[in-house]
């Protein structure tokens, strides 16, 4: 079983912001595989089903980004998830160029407050993650304003392809494992 968590902030105000690329990623996976998000459990919207023979739970924490760890820990406990082998977190990354994907088996939280919350609540950095590049803020723009801002029109036009590649990468993880997915998507 896999718990696949897309990070974001709840509410229409944040729906199309850079910080919500994780939510949009799990929405794309759900749509592709005919899964429907249902009312909350453990402060999350959930969609459950099978993807390529793997039981999956897609989750969108509704705790706001900075408290994502509360929802992730509650879900890991509820579903008896081993984070090192059965958790995948998808989130935005300022340190990667727009549309660059980076899959890792483990690693630090970096500057991402949602990941900091998850690491603090789980007490470990030993869990897989898929980082999605959103690029750096232009000029002297504040990072918080940037991540809570909307994509440019050119970026928004590129999102369907990007979200498709993210879904493809997750499917490779489920079918062939993390190493194969890292080898296939990290160099691009």
UniProtKB/Swiss-Prot annotation:
Database matches in CDD domains: PTH
Active site residues according to the UniProt entry: 19 (proton acceptor)
Keyword Hydrolase: yes
Residues at which tRNA binds: 14, 64, 66, 113
Record's catalysed reaction(s): an N-acyl-L-alpha-aminoacyl-tRNA + H2O = an N-acyl-L-amino acid + a tRNA + H(+)
Entry GO MF terms: peptidyl-tRNA hydrolase activity; tRNA binding
Enzyme type, top EC level: hydrolase
BP-aspect Gene Ontology terms: protein quality control for misfolded or incompletely synthesized proteins; rescue of stalled ribosome
Chief location of this protein within or outside the cell: cytoplasm
Record-listed E.C. numbers: 3.1.1.29
The keyword Transcription appears for this protein: no
Keywords: Cytoplasm, Hydrolase, RNA-binding, tRNA-binding
Family to which this protein belongs: Belongs to the PTH family.
Classification via PANTHER family: PEPTIDYL-TRNA HYDROLASE
Assembly information from the UniProt record: Monomer.
Official protein name in the record: Peptidyl-tRNA hydrolase
Originating organism: Chloroflexus aurantiacus (strain ATCC 29366 / DSM 635 / J-10-fl)
Lineage: Bacteria, Bacillati, Chloroflexota, Chloroflexia, Chloroflexales
């Amino acid at each position: 079983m896999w718990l696949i968590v897309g990070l974001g902030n709840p509410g229409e105000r944040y729906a199309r912001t850079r910080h919500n690329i994780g939510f949009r990623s799990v929405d794309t996976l759900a749509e592709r595989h005919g899964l429907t998000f249902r009312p909350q459990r453990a402060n999350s919207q959930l969609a459950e089903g099978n993807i390529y023979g793997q039981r999956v739970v897609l989750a969108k924490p509704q705790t706001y980004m900075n408290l994502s760890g509360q929802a992730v820990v509650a879900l890991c406990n509820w579903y008896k998830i081993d984070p090192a082998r059965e958790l995948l977190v998808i989130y935005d990354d300022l340190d990667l160029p727009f549309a660059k994907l980076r899959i890792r088996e483990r690693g630090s939280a970096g500057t991402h407050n949602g990941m900091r919350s998850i690491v603090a609540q789980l007490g470990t950095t030993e869990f897989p993650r898929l980082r999605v590049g959103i690029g750096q803020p232009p000029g002297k723009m504040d990072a918080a304003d940037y991540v809570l801002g909307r994509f440019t029109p050119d970026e928004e036009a590129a999102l369907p392809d990007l979200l498709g590649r993210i879904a493809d990468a997750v499917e490779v993880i489920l079918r062939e494992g993390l190493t194969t997915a890292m080898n296939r998507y990290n160099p691009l």
